[in-house]
Amino acid sequence: MANFYTDIPELKYHLNNPMMERICQLKERDYRDKDEFDYAPQDYADAMDSYDKILEITGEITGETIAPNAEGVDEEGPHCGNGRVEYASGTKQNLDAMVKAGLNGMTMPRRFGGLNFPITPYTMCAEIVAAADAGFGNIWSLQDCIETLYEFGNEDQHSRFIPRICAGETMSMDLTEPDAGSDLQSVMLKATFDEANNCWRLNGVKRFITNGDANLHLVLARSEEGTKDGRGLSMFIYDKNEGGVDVRRIENKLGIHGSPTCELVYKNAKAELCGDRKLGLIKYVMAVSYTHLTLPT
């Protein structure tokens, strides 16, 4: 069977870039995890061997499962019913294979169940997956939205949400609206603080949201009453388990059908602030610095 890693020697060439030694040292914090986790690398050579093996496993799953499923996934596509998205059967198989192989939350620290991968080998994994099915690549690689939560969320949010992504739950980034696309300063999805329940409530519509029925959403919303620019925006975390968001429809696209691009309706949806208020656009820039590395693959 094809292996989308070992069959492409250029990938290993890039993995062996001399800069990787310093990258590994920084990401592994001088290999401190070796005393706490038996699978953590002991040194640079051990780390590179681990990256190589994970890339080979990714290439194997891609060649044996994702690539053979790609045509059927594109023909079947996801379906929308009762406000929810049902993935194509092949997409479900792909997700299951990646979860069983432990290929989720790849860049997250080991204490949360992640692999603590540097962005370089993780991006290579994303390229391998997207080479077989760009639609599934969209769904799987959105796990890197968790980097924003890791950077700006508090310890309680880290402990509640990051292990779920490492265990295989999916993510989305809810930015675009009917009247706010590239100009995100025009976002008007309303965030109101519910004092009685000590939480935020989101109301409005998001459009063209990739993987819009994900388990966890990062949502850009207007938290400051009376504002009209970026200074009134904050980033929120929405958990699908809380309810309050329905998928109105899936966009009818020319291609990449396996990835559901959704219109979402927020109806008093419970959410929590990710980081400080009024810094939503800064968090967005942080988020896309990761997602734009993997989604174009």
Model-derived features: positions:
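Conserved small/polar residues in nucleotide/adenosyl-binding loops
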Residues: T291-T297
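Amphipathic, small/basic residue-rich leader segments at the start of a protein or domain
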Residues: M1-F136, D156, R160
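Internal maturation/activation junctions in enzymes
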Residues: S141-L142, G153-L189, F193, N198
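A short core secondary-structure module
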Residues: C199, N203-V245
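Flexible, glycine/threonine-enriched loop-and-boundary segments that flank and lead into catalytic domains
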Residues: R84-Q93, M106-T107, D174-D194, V205-R207, ...
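Extended, hydrophobic alpha-helical segments in both membrane/secreted and soluble proteins
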Residues: N104, M108, N116, P121-C125, ...
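Short Gly/Pro-enriched turn/cap motifs at secondary-structure boundaries
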Residues: D179-S182, F208-N211, T227, K253-P260
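A glycine-rich, basic-preceded beta-loop-alpha segment at the flavin cofactor/substrate interface
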Residues: N241-R248, E263-Y290
